[in-house]
């Protein structure tokens, strides 16, 4: 994906949400787990909240409160978009130096196990870390991962 453009952030966020491994070992180290959980919840619930907030005012014939209910509906609809936006920004953020070293160690460990990977990135981003973590949890056994988790 591209890291420029308004709509690409949402697309990158959705892709990153699908790529990030939902493992309990990662939850204390990264906020992604909580953001992904909240975003998935918002995708399911917030459209209903938006519709209910407008329909209740229409059913009770309260036209004076209709503008406020529309604002509430717009806010409710924006909640999942905010999650996708945050995830898209996070996916395209370059890793800090400590995580770059961890990324390289994991990459090397996966290569040593005999798995094929795309070439090592010199300036990896969080989406690259998500891909490597996915591969590590699928390819490596628990003893190889004990050092990090």
From Swiss-Prot:
Lineage summary: Bacteria, Pseudomonadati, Pseudomonadota, Gammaproteobacteria, Vibrionales
Keyword list, A-Z: Cell inner membrane, Cell membrane, Membrane, Transmembrane, Transmembrane helix
Pfam families associated with the record: DUF412
Residues spanning the membrane: 41-61, 69-89
HAMAP family per record: UPF0208
InterPro entries reported in the protein's UniProt record: UPF0208 (IPR007334)
Predominant place of localization: membrane
Family designation: Belongs to the UPF0208 family.
Taxonomy, superkingdom: Bacteria
GO CC annotations, alphabetized: plasma membrane
Protein's membrane topology: Multi-pass membrane protein
Subcellular location field: Cell inner membrane
Protein name in the entry: UPF0208 membrane protein VSAL_I2111
